[in-house]
């Protein structure tokens, strides 16, 4: 994996690995509702570049901002933090 400096890092779960050298990562964050003050889960999906097709569906991964690699890919895979359990 590449060295990444001064880039925003996200940790999320791989929800799709069907594309070649590309994974879809769902990142969950918590926001406070501006009227009710309740913490709300907000999730967003990002496409990330996985050069060696290392990440599999269900893995927990860290991705980092990068220059645009395609129309939708603007992140690269930094590391696979936790592999998914095979059932």
UniProtKB/Swiss-Prot annotation:
Keyword Transferase: no
InterPro entries registered for this protein in UniProt: NA-bd_OB-fold, Ribosomal_uS17, Ribosomal_uS17_bact/chlr, Ribosomal_uS17_CS
Keyword Phosphoprotein: no
SUPFAM superfamilies reported for this sequence: Nucleic acid-binding proteins
GO cellular component: cytosolic small ribosomal subunit
GO BP term, example: translation
One Pfam match: Ribosomal_S17
Keywords, alphabetical: Ribonucleoprotein, Ribosomal protein, RNA-binding, rRNA-binding
Domain of life: Bacteria
GO molecular function terms attached to this record: rRNA binding; structural constituent of ribosome
PANTHER family found in the cross-reference section: 40S RIBOSOMAL PROTEIN S11 FAMILY MEMBER (PTHR10744), SMALL RIBOSOMAL SUBUNIT PROTEIN US17M (PTHR10744:SF1)
Record function comment: One of the primary rRNA binding proteins, it binds specifically to the 5'-end of 16S ribosomal RNA.
Subunit annotation: Part of the 30S ribosomal subunit.
Family membership: Belongs to the universal ribosomal protein uS17 family.
UniProt-recorded name of the protein: Small ribosomal subunit protein uS17
